[in-house]
Regions:
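Short amphipathic alpha-helix segments
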Residues: 41-56, 108-112
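Reductase modules of NAD(P)H-dependent flavoproteins
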Residues: 285-409
Length: 409
C-alpha cells in the first residue's frame, strides 16, 4: 500500500488547480483527454491519474500534469462535491498503485480507515429503522459555520452494506470513498428544553436510508446504517452553501417549507432565529408520507408552547385518513391556508420563504433571455413568483431561497 498524497485545491470556474506534496512528472508537462485507454497496466503516474479522474467524474474533459501541479478542466463549474471527489482521486494515486486490487483483509481495511477517516459517530437516535438523527464528532475542532449550510459525509466502498445490492464499481474504486452532501440539522433544544448554543463540538445530521432502485444503487446510506456509536467515518471540514438567513430582518415573516429530511437545515435556522429573539412570525411546514417519518415533533412542540410567534404544521400524504384527499404544500398556498397558519399575508416586501426538499415541490425555473420558464408541474417557486416574490439566482439574493435535496444518487 502506498502513501496518501497531500493535496490542496483551488477551483476557479471550470478549471481547478490541485497542488501536491510531491512531483508527479519531470520537467515536461503531460496533457491528457478522456480517449486514453480504459486500462493501463504499468502506466506512468500522470496517465494513471488522468484515467482515474476521468472515471470518477464524466464531466472532466482535460487533465494537465506538470511537476506537483494538476490542472483539471470540467464541462461545468466546479462544486464542492466535485472538488472533494477529484482531491480524493489524487490523494489516493499511490494507494494500490498499479495493482488494480481491492483491499482483502481486516488489516488493510483498518489501515484504510486510519488514512481516510477523520471523525467519530458519537450519537444515534433511530426514529425508525430507516430514519436516523445522528451526530458526528470531528477529530479536530471545526470552524464556525452558518445554520442552513452543508458538508460531506463519506465511508469507504470497502465497508459492508446493509442490503444485498451489488455496487457497480469502476476499476480501483473499491478502496475509495462513497460521498454525499448533507445539510446540518439541529435538535434545537437540550434535555431541559433550553435552546442549544449556536456551536457544538459535534455536528447533527438527519438521514434516511435509501433503498436500491432498478436504476440507482445508493452507495453511502446502506453502509452508514450498519455503523454504531464509536465507529469511524469521514466528515468534510468545509461547510458551505448559500441557503442561510442572510438578508433576513428582525421583523420579517419567515416561512419554512420542506419535504422529508429536507427539514434538517430548517431546524438549524429556526433555532438560530429563536436565539436571536426574532420578532417576526415564523412558520415551519413539513410534508412527509407518513406521520412516522417525522423525527422532531417533540422538539417543535416545546418551541410552539414557548414562543408565541412560532408555528409548526405537518401534513402527510399516505396515512390512511388521507386516502383520496391528499394535500401538498402547493395546495396550502393555493387555498391561502398557509397565510392563516402564518397569521399574516404572504407579503413579498416583508416575507422570506425557504424551500428544501423534493424538486417537484420547489419547482425551480430555468432563467432564459425571454424570462423564467417554470416546470409543467406547479411548484412553490411559480406560486410565489406570481405573488411578487423574487427567487434567488446566482449572486442575486431574493426572498425565495431553495435547497434541492433529494435521494442519494
Amino acid at each position: 500500500m502506498g502513501q496518501l498524497i497531500q493535496v490542496e485545491a483551488s477551483p476557479m470556474g471550470q478549471v481547478a488547480l490541485f497542488s501536491t506534496d510531491r512531483s508527479l512528472t519531470g520537467q515536461d508537462g503531460v496533457s491528457l483527454t478522456p480517449d486514453i485507454p480504459e486500462t493501463s497496466d504499468g502506466a506512468d503516474p500522470p496517465h494513471e491519474l488522468a484515467r482515474r479522474l476521468f472515471d470518477a467524474d464524466r464531466l472532466i474533459d482535460h487533465v494537465h500534469v506538470l511537476s506537483n501541479t494538476v490542472s483539471v478542466r470540467r464541462r461545468q463549474t466546479w462544486d464542492d462535491e466535485a472538488v472533494e471527489r477529484a482531491r480524493d482521486v489524487i490523494a489516493n494515486l499511490f494507494v494500490y498503485y498499479g495493482t488494480g486490487s481491492a483491499p482483502t483483509d481486516a488489516d488493510e481495511f483498518e489501515q484504510l480507515r486510519v488514512e481516510n477517516y477523520n471523525a467519530t459517530l458519537s450519537h444515534i437516535r433511530a426514529h425508525n429503522e430507516d430514519l436516523w438523527v445522528m451526530r458526528v464528532t470531528p477529530d479536530e475542532p471545526i470552524d464556525p459555520f452558518l445554520p442552513g449550510q452543508y458538508t460531506t459525509l463519506a465511508l469507504g466502498y470497502w465497508e459492508p452494506r446493509a442490503d444485498e445490492a451489488r455496487d457497480n464499481l469502476k476499476p480501483d474504486q473499491d478502496h475509495k470513498m462513497a460521498r454525499r452532501s448533507y445539510s446540518v440539522s439541529s435538535s434545537m433544544i437540550d434535555e431541559s428544553g433550553q435552546l442549544l448554543p449556536p456551536h457544538s463540538p459535534d455536528v447533527e445530521f438527519y438521514i434516511v436510508k435509501v433503498k436500491p432502485g432498478e436504476e440507482e444503487i445508493p452507495a453511502l446510506t446502506p453502509r452508514l446504517f450498519l455503523k454504531g456509536v464509536g465507529d469511524r467515518l469521514y466528515m468534510g471540514r468545509k461547510f458551505t452553501g448559500h441557503y442561510t438567513l442572510e438578508g433576513v430582518k428582525p421583523d420579517d415573516s419567515i416561512v419554512f417549507l420542506s419535504t422529508g429530511t429536507g427539514e434538517a437545515p430548517q431546524n438549524a435556522m429556526i433555532a438560530e432565529l429563536l436565539r436571536r429573539e426574532h420578532r417576526g412570525r415564523i412558520l415551519d411546514v413539513v410534508c412527509v408520507r407518513y406521520r412516522s417519518d417525522l423525527a422532531y415533533t417533540e422538539q417543535h412542540a416545546v418551541l410552539v408552547d414557548r414562543y408565541p410567534t412560532y408555528r409548526y404544521v405537518t401534513i402527510t400524504t399516505r396515512d390512511p385518513e388521507n386516502e383520496g384527499k391528499k394535500v401538498y404544500i402547493q395546495d396550502l398556498i393555493t387555498s391561502s391556508q398557509i397565510e392563516k397558519d402564518l397569521g399574516a399575508p404572504l407579503d413579498p416586501h416583508r416575507t422570506h420563504v425557504f424551500l428544501c426538499g423534493n424538486p417537484s415541490m420547489i419547482g425551480l425555473p430555468k432563467w432564459t433571455e425571454e424570462g423564467l420558464v417554470f416546470p409543467e408541474t406547479l411548484g412553490v417557486c411559480q406560486q410565489l413568483y406570481e405573488k411578487g416574490f423574487t427567487i434567488d439566482h446566482r449572486k442575486d439574493r431574493g426572498n425565495v431561497h431553495y435547497e434541492e435535496y433529494w435521494t442519494e444518487r
